[in-house]
């Protein structure tokens, strides 16, 4: 009976080990994205992230999926959207168009910005910005 018990414990241990490694990698991804605001570079790919962290894109994807339920692009876009919202709220960026703010936040085009923003906030960036005006 003892052998059966051990057989059951090993996979659980492996899963726990895997999830700890996955959590660690996720934290490294977060740090890498936020340090120097790498998400502002529209060309910064999961592959580049993998190279920096000395891993591969499969592990990057798995770590993000395990910790957020989403994928690399969703995660990067969340940072970009948060950044864009902050810029729209700040008088420092009042001279920029909504499109320019989207590009500065790291979106590759106006369309990409509007689509991601509308999908998450259910409002266009322009309408959001107008709603901020006193």
Functional labels for PLM-detected ranges:
Residues 2-100, 116-119, 126:
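Membrane-proximal linker segments that couple transmembrane helices to downstream signaling/catalytic modules
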Residues 55, 107-108:
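The short coil/loop that forms the "turn" connecting the two helices of the helix-turn-helix
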Residues 58, 110-111:
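Key DNA-contact positions within bacterial/archaeal DNA-binding proteins
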Residues 103:
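Conserved short loop/turn motifs at secondary-structure junctions
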Residues 131-134:
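Long cytosolic C-terminal regulatory regions of eukaryotic multi-pass membrane proteins
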């Amino acid at each position: 009976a003892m052998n059966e018990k051990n057989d059951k414990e090993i996979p659980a241990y492996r899963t726990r080990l895997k999830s700890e490694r996955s959590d660690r990698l996720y934290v490294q991804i977060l740090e890498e994205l936020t340090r120097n605001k790498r998400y502002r570079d529209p060309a910064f790919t999961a592959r580049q992230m993998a190279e920096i962290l000395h891993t591969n894109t499969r592990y990057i994807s798995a770590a993000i999926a395990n910790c957020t339920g989403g994928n690399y692009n969703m995660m990067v876009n969340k940072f970009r959207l948060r950044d864009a919202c902050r810029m729209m709220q700040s008088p420092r960026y009042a001279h920029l168009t909504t499109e320019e703010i989207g590009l500065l936040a790291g979106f590759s085009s106006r369309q990409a910005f509007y689509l991601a923003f509308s999908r998450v906030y259910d409002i266009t960036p322009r309408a959001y910005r107008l709603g901020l005006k006193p």
